[in-house]
Amino acid sequence: MKPGFSPRGGGFGGRGGFGDRGGRGGGRGGRGGFGGGRGGFGGGGRGRGGGGGGFRGRGGGGGRGGGFQSGGNRGRGGGRGGKRGNQSGKNVMVEPHRHEGVFICRGKEDALVTKNLVPGESVYGEKRVSISEGDDKIEYRAWNPFRSKLAAAILGGVDQIHIKPGAKVLYLGAASGTTVSHVSDIVGPDGLVYAVEFSHRSGRDLINLAKKRTNIIPVIEDARHPHKYRMLIAMVDVIFADVAQPDQTRIVALNAHTFLRNGGHFVISIKANCIDSTASAEAVFASEVKKMQQENMKPQEQLTLEPYERDHAVVVGVYRPPPKVKN
């Protein structure tokens, strides 16, 4: 066997790149080593059909691989990873996705994109593509489902994300702002994103992001204590949560009771291992849904994030729905 070759997996070390969480083949490796954060240098969805962190998603034709990266390893059945994206927009069409504010870039590879609120700026080194519409040039940013749970849910076919132009969103667990930047693109200049992050190190990145994007309001505070930042945040339409804590449903509920309007919606990303690493993922998801129901949060759909994330699910629902009027 060749050194550094793992049987099932695109690239070095199964899922993700050169070490990124180890994957099924490589040594454990820091969470991001050479792999540029989940799904890095060639590790596509769970090693099957990698193609450079595959950007192809379940929506696009073709295998799960065939990425938007340059080159990319072959993985199993994943086509070659495609050349560098079309910077100039030759032979590229952008069409609206059914979720308002989200678009699909159709070219040699299909990719999920959002309209860049700050043209000319990349947030985390993502590809950008400019499309000429009449005299104007509109710039779109590629949205990588291996680095964003929300993009993974959209490509997985989630029915509603409730995040749309003009919406006010409370984002719990904002980290460095990778997904937050795309949410900021979607809600546009008329919307707002309150981004809550406890880590000061990630918070610095978030504050720098907010300097350029005026619709992001960074809150460097613990989401367990919403009363500490209630003076900063108005009522919101949607809560998006990616906090990966054992008591995350309680954290979301506390914030919902404080900031979410009645009839507002929530989108929660659940990582089974973070809640109970001994139970099966399905059992964990079911128990979290039960907890939500006890908090006046009514789940409407649940979706696993395969092939982008292992043992993750997204639950979308409505908070304190108005009572149905009986005729």
Curated annotation (Swiss-Prot):
Amino acids binding S-adenosyl-L-methionine: 178-179, 197-198, 222-223, 242-245
N6-acetyllysine: residues bearing it: 108, 127, 211-212
Biased composition regions of type Gly residues, renumbered to the chain: 7-80
Positions of crosslink type Glycyl lysine isopeptide (Lys-Gly) (interchain with G-Cter in SUMO2): 90, 108, 115, 137, 149, 164
Localization of this protein: Nucleus, Nucleolus; Nucleus, Nucleoplasm
Region (Disordered): 1-95
Chief location bin: nucleus
One term of GO molecular function: TFIID-class transcription factor complex binding
Processing and modification events after translation: By homology to other fibrillarins, some or all of the N-terminal domain arginines are modified to asymmetric dimethylarginine (DMA).
Positions carrying Asymmetric dimethylarginine: 8, 15, 21, 24, 28, 31
InterPro entries in the cross-refs: Fibrillarin, Fibrillarin_CS, SAM-dependent_MTases_sf
Modified positions (Phosphoserine) in chain numbering: 122, 130, 132
Superkingdom of origin: Eukaryota
Gene Ontology BP annotations: ribosomal small subunit biogenesis; rRNA methylation; sno(s)RNA metabolic process; snoRNA localization
NCBIfam families in the cross-refs: PRK04266.1-2
Function according to Swiss-Prot or TrEMBL: S-adenosyl-L-methionine-dependent methyltransferase that has the ability to methylate both RNAs and proteins. Involved in pre-rRNA processing by catalyzing the site-specific 2'-hydroxyl methylation of ribose moieties in pre-ribosomal RNA. Site specificity is provided by a guide RNA that base pairs with the substrate. Methylation occurs at a characteristic distance from the sequence involved in base pairing with the guide RNA. Probably catalyzes 2'-O-methylation of U6 snRNAs in box C/D RNP complexes. U6 snRNA 2'-O-methylation is required for mRNA splicing fidelity.
PANTHER family linked to this entry: RRNA 2'-O-METHYLTRANSFERASE FIBRILLARIN, RRNA 2-O-METHYLTRANSFERASE FIBRILLARIN
Description of how the protein assembles with itself and partners: Component of box C/D small nucleolar ribonucleoprotein (snoRNP) particles that contain SNU13, FBL, NOP5 and NOP56, plus a guide RNA. It is associated with the U3, U8, U13, X and Y small nuclear RNAs. Component of several ribosomal and nucleolar protein complexes. Part of the small subunit (SSU) processome, composed of more than 70 proteins and the RNA chaperone small nucleolar RNA (snoRNA) U3. Interacts with PRMT5 and UTP20. Interacts with DDX5 and C1QBP. Interacts with NOL11. Interacts with PIH1D1. Interacts with RRP1B. Interacts with NOLC1. Interacts with SDE2. Interacts with NOP2 and NOP56.
Protein name: rRNA 2'-O-methyltransferase fibrillarin
Lineage start: Eukaryota, Metazoa, Chordata, Craniata, Vertebrata
